């Protein structure tokens, strides 16, 4: 990659990192460990490539929400048909509820743990394909203030946590997200 002038590589996560307190999500799979990420990060750094963590934080959380521990955080507890389902005829929760403070608490704890393994001061929080936003628990708030405002309020809560962590790390964190 370095010979092709790449200077940044984003490591995309959904449920493919071995989060310490969340084994139920990755059990039976082959998630990356902290040690593996640190080795990859050092390898990239030595080649002037910035390795940036990318953890979806609203949509694409179905691999979490199918488990009882996380299901209460879902936008639609009874689920929906979505294109990323392993079984297309089965309804399952897809996204976190943007108006549930527990959703913010979960994703910021994931970000905090993940960031410990990266040199980069950047974090891509995904936020794409929020196909169920406003169709479940956040529906009334979306009607009241608008779906866009609900989305931005959730994004800002996550970003504010990153800024608090910036102070702890001694450098300004840059929050990135997709623009769809």
In which residue ranges do the predicted regions lie?
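Substrate-binding cleft of carbohydrate-active enzyme catalytic domains
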Residues: 1-168
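Substrate-binding cleft/loops of secretory-pathway carbohydrate-active enzymes
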Residues: 169-180
């Amino acid at each position: 990659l370095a010979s092709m002038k790449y200077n940044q590589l984003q490591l995309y996560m959904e449920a493919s990192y071995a989060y310490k307190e969340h084994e139920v999500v990755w059990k039976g799979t082959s998630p990356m460990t902290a040690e593996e990420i640190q080795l990859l990060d050092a390898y990239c750094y030595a080649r002037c490539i910035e390795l940036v963590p990318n953890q979806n934080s609203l949509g694409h959380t179905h691999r979490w929400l199918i488990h009882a521990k996380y299901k209460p955080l879902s936008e639609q507890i009874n689920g929906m048909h979505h294109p990323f389902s392993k079984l297309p005829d089965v309804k399952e929760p897809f996204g976190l509820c943007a108006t549930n403070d527990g959703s913010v608490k979960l994703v910021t704890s994931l970000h905090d743990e993940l960031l410990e393994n990266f040199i980069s001061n950047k974090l891509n929080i995904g936020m794409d394909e929020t196909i169920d936003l406003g169709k479940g628990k956040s529906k009334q708030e979306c009607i009241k203030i608008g779906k866009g405002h609900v989305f931005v309020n959730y994004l800002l809560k996550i970003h504010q946590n990153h800024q608090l962590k910036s102070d702890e790390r001694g450098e300004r964190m840059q929050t990135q997200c997709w623009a769809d």
